[in-house]
Amino acid sequence: LPLGFYECPYPYKRILSPKVVEFCADSGRFYFLKDTCCDIEGIRKKLEIMKGSNMKLYNANTSTLLESMKYGAAGYSGVMANFHPALYAWLLENWEKEPEKAEYLQDILTPCSFIELKNYPLSAKTYLAKEIGFSIKARTRKNTADYISETELSELRQIKELSDRAME
């Protein structure tokens, strides 16, 4: 049975040590690591350990994403894909072919990712419903505010506008 790990980013940061990553990679049973360390040197070390194994690293942090891809990360597995799935897909598919545009896009996506710190996941569900047009209700089991303020709605609209311009 192929297994994977999701490092816990919140509320208590739980990151796999290089020793644990080595054990998992050497076992042959682990195929997936959602990395949440947000540290390119830590990511680079894990990728070096996993080289040649079944285990693949998926970065959850936007600001280190492009550099992690250059070191061999397999992809992205962060919550911001709830806001910008097409932009992350483009980045992952085209970063080698169009490196300057990929850098530009990451420069936009990184500050956009700060919205994650405000009322997530309700903000993502509201964004998908109001800005993208998905037919979903903005409900969540997480203990956050039960509404999005006008300021937050304005921020979500601005993120949508910025992400639309990013692909022009």
Regions found by a protein language model. Give the residues of each.
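Catalytic alpha/beta core domains of metabolic enzymes, predominantly
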Residues: 8-118
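C-terminal alpha-helical cap/extension of soluble enzyme domains
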Residues: 73, 80-168
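Short beta-strands and strand-loop turn motifs
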Residues: 2-8
